[in-house]
Structure formats: C-alpha cells, structure tokens
C-alpha cells in the first residue's frame, strides 16, 4: 500500500465516540422518557425557555443539548419551525452539531465561573440571532458557576427575550441553586442499560467490520457503568489492541479483570482450607493485572 495513502487514512480516522455521536433524538439510546416529553412539548408548541440536563458523565448531556439546539433552529426547504422530526440535514444543522454555529454559544462553566462571564451573556441576549431562529446558550457543568454568577443569571432566566433559549448541563445537580432549577425544565438522563450498550456496540462493530465476541462486548458494557461514551472509548481501545477480532480474553486482560474460572478456582481453594494454594492463585491473578 502507498504510505501516503496509509497516512491519509490514519489522518481521517475519528474515534468511535465522535463518529457515532447521535445527530437527532432517535439516536439517543436509553433516554425515551425525555424524548417523549420533548416530542409532546414541540408538537403542542409548549417549548420551555430553559432546560436543565443532569446525569453522570457520558450519558449524552452535551449531545442532547446540541440536538435540542438543532431542533429549535431546524429549517429546510419543506420545514421552517421547531421540530423533533429532523429527517434531513437543515440549513443550520451541521454547524450546530459541530459546535461552530454563531447563534449557538457553548460555554464551559468550569473555566468561566465568574459574574463577568454571565454579564457578557446578559448583554448579548438583547441582540437578535444572526441567522438562526433562536440564540441558544449551552452552559456545561453549570454547577461550577459562582453564587454571584447564578444570582446575575436569575433575572434573565425569569424573563428571557423571546429569541433566546438556555440549555444547562451538570453532573452535580445538588450544587445548582433551587432558584435556578425552578426556572428550568429538568431532565435526568439515565445510566444506559448494559444490554442496550452491548447491542449498540455490536451494531458499531458490524459497521466497522470488526468481529467481537459476545462476552467481550458484555465486559465492555459492564465496565462502562451506564456511559455510552465510555463504552465506545473502551471498544475503540479494544479494537486498537486486538485489531478486527476483539476477544473476551483480550478485553479481560486490557481491563484488568479476572478470568471467571480462575476466580472459581480461588474460592475452591478457600473452601478446602488450602490457604497456600489460595494465596498463590490470588498472587497469580494480581500479577496478570486483575483488580483486587
């Protein structure tokens, strides 16, 4: 193979978590209650001014925020209104999904915690969107804002201009003041069931031309602890480790998990009272990287 072609292929590679990031609400796995509520709200025209998305890392908070911003600003030749049904890529969709649309402003509250950052937002909300229907502010890790910053935001949240929407995301909802929560429609994004994660990884494996053993996918799904992003990252690592054939043995070694049969052997030694053999087996498993 031409080395230049190989380099180009490598340069074009995207990690699985980005390559298979959902682009509409139908792609959000395990979040059906939220999707149902938003579908009804958009269909009836009862669209909130602010949303609070909460959940553990990797369940899709930022992705949901971008999809929601896309739905609010959806515009095609046939559709020019907010909608959950986004079958085609609209005028603003690609830029919003890639986080580069001028009217969808993303801010990481972890690095913009002060009142000055919020004052800048308050000054900007007066102005109409440049090209989209709504100016959407996505504030990630909103719990990191200072008390002053939260207080400065309250008035704008209470009476925002009709062309402005706020979407907040947080992993620590208890740190968000109740005065802010009461002004938002709250969605608790669930940990994704391991069976759903396993099924989705199998689908990705098929698209990527990767053969993955069921036990390997099951171990990855359990290790992800409800986070699809973590599952995709681990799967990515497993593919890099084993190539186009991901085995349970390789994943077990990569994750530092004990072989089930060896765990049973350890317990059998203990039940027999053979402490020396049990300690030897324990040591052997520890040396191979198993988590004690």
Regions found by a protein language model. Name each.
Residues 2-5, 65, 85, 92, ...:
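Extended, largely alpha-helical regulatory/partner-binding modules appended to the mid-to-C-terminal parts
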Residues 1-186:
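P-loop/Walker A NTP-binding region and its immediately flanking N-terminal helices
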């Amino acid at each position: 193979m031409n080395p230049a072609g190989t380099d180009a292929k490598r340069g074009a590679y995207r990690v699985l978590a980005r390559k298979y990031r959902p682009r509409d609400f139908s792609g959000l796995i395990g979040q059906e209650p939220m999707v149902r509520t938003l579908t009804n709200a958009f269909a009836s025209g009862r669209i909130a001014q602010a949303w609070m998305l909460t959940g553990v890392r990797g369940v899709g908070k930022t992705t949901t925020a971008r999809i929601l911003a896309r739905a609010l600003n959806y515009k095609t030749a046939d559709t020019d209104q907010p909608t959950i049904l986004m079958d085609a890529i609209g005028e603003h969709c690609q830029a919003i999904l890639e986080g580069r649309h001028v009217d969808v402003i993303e801010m990481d509250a972890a690095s913009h915690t002060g009142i000055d950052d919020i004052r800048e937002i308050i000054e900007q909300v007066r102005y109409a969107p440049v090209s989209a229907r709504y100016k959407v502010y996505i504030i990630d890790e909103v719990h990191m804002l200072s008390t002053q910053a939260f207080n400065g935001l309250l008035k704008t949240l209470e009476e925002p201009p009709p062309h402005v929407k706020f979407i907040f995301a947080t992993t620590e909802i208890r740190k968000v003041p109740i005065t802010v929560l009461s002004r938002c429609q709250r969605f608790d994004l669930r940990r994704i069931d391991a069976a759903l994660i396993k099924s989705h990884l199998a689908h990705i494996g098929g698209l990527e031309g990767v053969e993955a053993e069921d036990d390997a996918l099951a171990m990855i799904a359990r290790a992800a602890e409800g986070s699809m992003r973590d599952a995709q990252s681990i799967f990515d690592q497993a593919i890099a480790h084993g190539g186009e054939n991901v085995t349970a043995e390789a994943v077990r070694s990569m994750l530092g998990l004990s072989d089930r049969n060896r765990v049973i052997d350890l317990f059998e030694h203990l039940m027999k009272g053979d402490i020396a053999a049990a300690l030897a087996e324990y040591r052997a498993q520890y040396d191979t990287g198993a988590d004690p």
